[in-house]
């Protein structure tokens, strides 16, 4: 509800800039042409992930992960980190924050292990692992359009090195700080109650099978080069038909992320007006120019600072005109994707993650979160930009 109110305020403010002529209608038309397919994809993928979760796919994986951990905390943690990374890369960071967080917390509780290292792993990877593919993050989709609509394979070729670095640094930090907790063992046959995961979601094997097939077909389609909203919409429609037959009560209008849509549309309008008035020119004085290591690091740090002060989406939109080539665009994405680890509002995924934790009676203090983030975020950005400078276009091994 809070997000919807903010979105409504932004939408009204954006509407005022249009009606008063501050933002010309022609610019609005260009903006709509750019973001409509992206928002269509976001809606479709939200429906897909919600229905897949209702079918019990994530819960099925969670039940097996505890067994695959072989009673060793470190192995279970690595498996859950892989789970969160793959979920972020292929289903987006918000999916990890909203749907995988309860699963990860429940698995840790069932194993009788401390929740904090697992919860932090989830939210950090939801952000830092969102660099590899366009579908991983809304900022990536916008960047893909800005880069001339390059294919997912070309995008991954640009981002693979910083993406690997951005995943490894937070994991290394957690492995060091929580080394005692991760040395523990657990009983593989634990009978602890599965708090936070609905048992009704696993009762329909037909829906579980349909969801698995849809996901197996959807993931390669999303990286095939076809406009991503098309396979996402087809997957949402297929699952919608299956649920209409098997569990029609699940199909409700709340499957569509109305608050997120309202917030995003309003934000796009306001930021577009700011760009039209020259906000990006002022930001350019801070972000600098050039594509050497220090220049790329400066741009990435600017994106991270803007993300933690305001939010990563407006930080990206305002700095986008400053990313004039693939190297600088990659550096900006490192900043706005891997940098929002300090303040609660830096990324929507972090707020969604914390909301899920509160619902499950897991206490994570923002002060401690920020202190950890002040260490992890700069180290992650430094490592990711270094990887970009070495392996990216024009780099030593690029």
PLM segments and residue spans:
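Interfacial loop-to-helix junctions that mark the boundaries of transmembrane helices
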Residues: 1-4, 25-38, 152-162, 202-204, ...
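Hydrophobic mid-bilayer segments of alpha-helices in multi-pass membrane transport proteins
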Residues: 1-23, 34-47, 99, 207-217, ...
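Membrane-embedded alpha-helical segments and adjacent helix-loop junctions characteristic
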Residues: 25, 29-114, 258-260, 264-326
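Alpha-helical transmembrane segments
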Residues: 34-46, 154-172, 327-343
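Membrane-interface alpha-helices at helix entry/exit sites of multi-pass transporters
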Residues: 71-79, 110-122, 150-161, 326-337, ...
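Alpha-helical transmembrane segments and, especially, the helix-loop junctions at the ends
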Residues: 88-98, 115-149, 170-171, 307-317, ...
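Juxtamembrane and boundary regions of transmembrane helices in multi-pass small-molecule transporters
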Residues: 153-199, 345-398
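Long, contiguous bundles of hydrophobic transmembrane helices that form the permeation core
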Residues: 167-247
């Amino acid at each position: 509800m809070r997000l919807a109110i903010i979105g409504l305020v932004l939408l009204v403010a954006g509407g005022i800039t249009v009606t008063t002529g501050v933002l010309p209608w022609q610019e609005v038309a260009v903006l709509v042409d750019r973001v409509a397919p992206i928002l269509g994809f976001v809606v479709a993928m939200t429906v897909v992930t919600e229905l897949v979760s209702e079918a019990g796919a994530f819960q099925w994986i969670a039940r097996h992960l505890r067994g695959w951990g072989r009673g060793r905390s470190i192995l279970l943690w690595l498996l859950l980190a892989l789970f969160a990374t793959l979920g972020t890369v292929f289903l987006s960071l918000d999916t990890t924050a909203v749907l995988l967080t309860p699963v990860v917390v429940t698995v840790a509780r069932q194993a009788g292990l401390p929740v904090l290292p697992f919860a932090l792993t989830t939210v950090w990877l939801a952000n830092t692992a969102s660099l590899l593919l366009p579908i991983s993050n809304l900022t990536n989709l916008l960047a893909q359009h800005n880069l001339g609509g390059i294919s997912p394979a070309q995008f991954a070729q640009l981002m693979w090195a910083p993406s690997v670095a951005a995943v490894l640094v937070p994991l290394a930090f957690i492995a060091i700080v929580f080394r005692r907790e991760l040395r523990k063992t657990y009983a593989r046959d634990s009978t602890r109650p599965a708090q936070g995961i609905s048992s009704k979601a696993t009762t329909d094997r037909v829906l579980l099978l349909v969801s698995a097939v849809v996901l197996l077909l959807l993931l390669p389609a999303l990286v095939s080069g076809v406009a991503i909203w098309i396979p996402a919409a087809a997957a949402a429609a297929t699952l919608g038909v299956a649920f209409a037959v098997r569990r029609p009560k699940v199909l409700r209008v709340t499957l569509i992320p109305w608050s997120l849509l309202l917030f995003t549309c309003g934000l796009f309008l306001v930021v577009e007006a700011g760009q039209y008035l020259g906000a990006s020119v002022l930001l350019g004085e801070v972000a600098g120019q050039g594509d050497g290591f220090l220049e790329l690091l400066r741009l990435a740090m600017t994106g991270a600072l803007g993300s933690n002060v305001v939010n990563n989406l407006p930080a990206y939109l305002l700095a986008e005109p400053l990313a004039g080539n693939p190297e600088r665009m990659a550096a900006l994405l490192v900043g706005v994707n891997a940098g929002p680890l300090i303040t609660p509002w830096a990324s929507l995924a972090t707020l969604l993650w914390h909301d899920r934790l509160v619902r499950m009676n897991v206490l994570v203090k923002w002060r401690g979160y920020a202190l950890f983030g002040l260490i992890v975020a700069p180290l992650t950005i430094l490592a990711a930009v270094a990887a970009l400078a070495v392996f990216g276009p024009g780099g030593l091994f690029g």
